[in-house]
């Protein structure tokens, strides 16, 4: 049954939206970048790169790693595609499937594997400054969450600005939690963050 639900989720994400030739959430298609951000309790690392075309439709891959002060860990991968849901100049809106593997410190150590969906938006505010606002949301339903967890919820909002050349400063807020079986919810992130992005090409 979970295999059937996995197939349905992927199909809805990739086929339910009208997909266009994709651009990465960076300045131009095909670019690659690495991010490093830190908050009071959480360190986050991310790699953004181009993905192989799917039926002629381009896309990008987003790999992330998160480590908390209490030594909880989450590794994630997203395959994102641009859509024309919101045909607004300077706005990119993407949807795609995501996979998370987490080690939580709730109660006894808990391992979680989740399949879900993500949506992300980026709006370019001032091109000459490299100033953009961004936000994203992720969700994994209970039927696709394995281990001692029910659901995954992940929300991020922030902004970036170019400091020099390929170097950008990032800042924002992230709220990320798992709902657990017979235990209180486990929030991995609920704080502001700041960091840098290095654009590789």
What feature does the model see in each segment?
Residues 1-4:
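Positively charged n-region of N-terminal signal peptides that target proteins for export
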Residues 7-16:
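Bacterial N-terminal signal peptides
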Residues 8, 24, 31-35, 151, ...:
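Short, flexible coil/linker segments at or flanking structured domains
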Residues 18-79, 201:
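Short glycine/proline- and aromatic-enriched beta-strand/turn motifs that initiate or cap beta-hairpins
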Residues 34-40, 59-67, 77-79, 95-103, ...:
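Transmembrane beta-barrel strands of outer-membrane/channel proteins
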Residues 51, 83-92, 100-201:
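Outer-membrane beta-barrel transmembrane domain signature
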Residues 56-60, 74-78, 90-96, 112-116:
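Short connector loops at helix/strand junctions that flank enzyme active sites
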């Amino acid at each position: 049954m979970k295999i059937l639900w996995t197939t349905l989720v992927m199909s809805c994400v990739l086929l339910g939206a009208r997909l266009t030739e994709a651009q990465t959430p960076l300045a131009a298609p095909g670019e690659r970048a690495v991010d490093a951000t830190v908050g009071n309790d959480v360190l986050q690392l991310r790699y953004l790169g181009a993905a192989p075309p799917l039926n002629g439709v381009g896309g990008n891959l987003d790999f992330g790693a998160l480590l908390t002060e209490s030594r909880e860990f989450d590794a994630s991968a997203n395959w994102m595609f641009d859509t024309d849901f919101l045909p607004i100049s300077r706005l990119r809106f993407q949807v795609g499937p995501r996979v998370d593997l987490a080690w939580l410190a709730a109660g006894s150590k808990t391992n979680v594997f989740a399949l879900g969906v993500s949506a992300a938006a980026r709006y370019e505010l001032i091109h000459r400054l490299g100033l953009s606002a961004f936000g994203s949301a992720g969700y994994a339903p209970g039927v696709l969450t394995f281990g001692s967890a029910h659901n995954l919820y992940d929300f991020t909002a922030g902004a970036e600005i170019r400091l020099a050349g390929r170097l950008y400063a990032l800042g924002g807020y992230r709220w990320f939690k798992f709902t657990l079986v017979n235990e209180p919810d486990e929030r991995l992130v609920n704080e502001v963050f700041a960091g840098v992005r290095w654009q590789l090409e």
